[in-house]
């Protein structure tokens, strides 16, 4: 009986033929690139199916990321706010550090004598006593601080140490009612005592004669008398001059230059009291004060005319005008000009009349 379907090649032959065809196609594609264009067409035709099959996955990822990113954004926002706050606080501290650096530079730049030593200290507290004006500093006996030690700032005299502990000390301010300080007027070298009147008021110069030559704006410096404070440091500037007609006295007030209500950094001085037995002359104090004022408080310095003549140089001032006498032709008037400074100073120490309007007219009589 003849079968309906004829038998074809065996499976093994088919497999061998398929393998040979596949190898031929692979070799032809690798050598000649015959099917590269066909693959490109096939990838282009199949690519929409890739997007369609990947769309659900991208949708689910987007939804989950949206839900999770809100909390993450809130955390990041909170962290950024905290970081911004810290940066702003650091900027504020940077400004404060710059101010402190400038103050310390001014403080360390205060001119001193060669035999004077200094140490920077900081005010850590103020004494809450309505009857005493004191501050507490962060230096004590371990740092060599002693009672009576002078204390200054970058603008002038502050006070003196009155109590010393191991790590801290108390400083009595010059504005305290129990404090008195020997001073000298820079313009004419008059020496007086400046007494404290409370830090809310100015220093007071009491019981001065009515004709005392002290004016508003005069700079008062330490005279060095008593050996406690160094010579030539600025203390105050005269703020008011009032005449007491009943007692023929002049009441003078002077505003401290150190800014006693805004103290932060101070200088402790050593060696200022070594020459207490031999204080400087008024002329030397005048010279030292001018040198220190040029660095410490140039904005308060009066004009050179208001300071008066330079006292250490009277001899050179007299010798210089003599060559000009032949040009003027008047030898009698030449020596009169150099004697004017001495005449201006002599009435200040002489006993003047009681009337405040007559001293200028009697100045020649004081000669």
From Swiss-Prot:
The keyword Calcium does not apply. Pfam families: MreC. It is found in: Cell inner membrane. One of its GO terms (biological process) is regulation of cell shape. InterPro entries: Cell/Rod_1, Cell/Rod_MreC_2, MreC, MreC_beta-barrel_core. Residues 345-357 have a biased composition (Polar residues). Involved in formation and maintenance of cell shape. Responsible for formation of rod shape. May also contribute to regulation of formation of penicillin-binding proteins. Self-associates. Interacts with MreB and MreD. Belongs to the MreC family. This is Cell shape-determining protein MreC. The lineage of its organism: Bacteria, Pseudomonadati, Pseudomonadota, Gammaproteobacteria, Enterobacterales.
């Amino acid at each position: 009986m003849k079968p309906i379907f004829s038998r074809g090649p065996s499976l093994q032959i088919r497999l061998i033929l398929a393998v040979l065809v596949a190898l031929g196609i692979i070799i032809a594609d690798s050598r000649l690139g015959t099917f590269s264009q066909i693959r490109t067409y096939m990838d282009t035709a199949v690519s929409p199916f890739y997007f369609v099959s990947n769309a659900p996955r991208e949708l689910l990822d987007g939804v989950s990321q949206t839900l999770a990113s809100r909390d993450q954004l809130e955390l990041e926002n909170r962290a950024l706010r905290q970081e911004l706050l810290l940066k702003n606080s650091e900027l504020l501290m940077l400004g404060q550090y710059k101010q402190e650096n400038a103050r310390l530079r001014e403080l360390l730049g205060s001119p001193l004598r060669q035999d004077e030593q200094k140490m920077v200290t900081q005010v850590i507290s103020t004494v809450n006593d309505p009857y005493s004006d004191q501050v507490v500093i962060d230096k004590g006996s371990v740092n060599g601080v002693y009672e009576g030690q002078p204390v200054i700032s970058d603008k002038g005299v502050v006070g003196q140490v009155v109590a010393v502990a191991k790590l801290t000390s108390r400083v009595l301010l010059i504005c305290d009612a129990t404090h008195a300080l020997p001073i000298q007027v820079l313009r004419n070298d008059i020496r007086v005592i400046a007494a404290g009147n409370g830090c809310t008021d100015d220093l007071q110069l009491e019981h001065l004669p009515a004709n005392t030559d002290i004016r508003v704006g005069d700079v008062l410096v330490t005279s060095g008398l008593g050996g406690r404070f160094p010579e030539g440091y600025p203390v105050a500037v005269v703020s008011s001059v009032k005449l007491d007609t009943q007692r023929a006295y002049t009441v003078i007030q002077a505003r401290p230059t150190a800014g006693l209500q805004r103290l932060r950094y101070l200088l402790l001085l050593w060696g200022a009291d070594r020459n207490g037995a031999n204080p400087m002359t008024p002329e030397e104090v005048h010279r030292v004060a001018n040198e220190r004022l040029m660095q410490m408080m140039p904005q308060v310095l009066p004009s050179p005319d208001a300071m008066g003549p330079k006292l250490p140089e009277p001899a050179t001032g007299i010798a210089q005008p003599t060559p000009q006498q032949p040009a003027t032709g008047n030898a009698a008037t030449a020596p009169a000009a150099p004697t004017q400074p001495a005449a201006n100073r002599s009435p200040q120490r002489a006993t003047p009349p009681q009337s405040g309007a007559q001293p200028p007219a009697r100045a020649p009589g004081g000669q």
